[in-house]
Amino acid sequence: MLNSFKLSLQYILPKLWLTRLAGWGASKRAGWLTKLVIDLFVKYYKVDMKEAQKPDTASYRTFNEFFVRPLRDEVRPIDTDPNVLVMPADGVISQLGKIEEDKILQAKGHNYSLEALLAGNYLMANLFRNGTFVTTYLSPRDYHRVHMPCNGILREMIYVPGDLFSVNHLTAQNVPNLFARNERVICLFDTEFGPMAQILVGATIVGSIETVWAGTITPPREGIIKRWTWPAGENDGSVALLKGQEMGRFKLGSTVINLFAPGKVNLVEQLESLSVTKIGQPLAVSTETFVTPDAEPAPLPAEEIEAEHDASPLVDDKKDQV
């Protein structure tokens, strides 16, 4: 009964105006009132402030500053294995698995369209048909900066206007085509593991979505699809990001969806729906080995060892003596 009421509110409430109001309030400096709101939020959601670079809630001038607070580097170490892709966000996995042609699993018994998620861009969709996806939900208590799973060169960004439904587990199980309906920012990267899309999905009360290369993408909410492109490789104007580097952030909210090309990566076997995610931990492994970390060096053939012994030294030991 309660869940039905909550779902009804999702359709009845003026989500856009609520989101604008929340964004406006979260950006205001209100002194003691700001601190009070932050303290209540920390207590209610059990936010671990010991992980933050600034653990004192009085150091945040606005609620938004608190919400996108940076963490201390050592609390999210990045897996350095070049064959491993890492988790892009703190949260829980909503769903993950194989993309079945054009179908992505939203919740048990509910699929949505890959092409619809990508705003009807069939050329981009073709890159990921029968590939792999991971959907990560960020709850209010989580760190809300989003990082790179691997090294990447940005090629395209698309802003897609849409609804602002909540993206929690209740709505994911009950609102059809949720992620293809909500406002979102699609980022396409060239990587060592083939093309990768990282999609930042908005929701109710999500005041803004930002990227490190373009700043605030939304608001303003103009109701039209916008598209930007960047050059490949090391050309002038290209945007290159490293594994584990921040690429964007939410000011309240939301969900991150990753898409990988078919045959390029295998998801870590232990991961399943509702698995907890932490930035920097293993998410997937390449199907091809680029470098074997900590591998024992192969022994030199005997003839090469003898040749090394016979070679003249690069430094004259006698000359260097004092």
Swiss-Prot record:
Pathway: Phospholipid metabolism; phosphatidylethanolamine biosynthesis; phosphatidylethanolamine from CDP-diacylglycerol: step 2/2. Disulfide bonds: none annotated. It is a peripheral membrane protein. Residues 293-322 are annotated as: Disordered. The modification Pyruvic acid (Ser) is found at residue 254. GO terms for cellular component: plasma membrane. It comes from the Bacteria. It is found in: Cell membrane. It is an enzyme of class 4 (lyase). Catalyzes the formation of phosphatidylethanolamine (PtdEtn) from phosphatidylserine (PtdSer). Heterodimer of a large membrane-associated beta subunit and a small pyruvoyl-containing alpha subunit. This is Phosphatidylserine decarboxylase proenzyme. It comes from Escherichia coli (strain 55989 / EAEC).
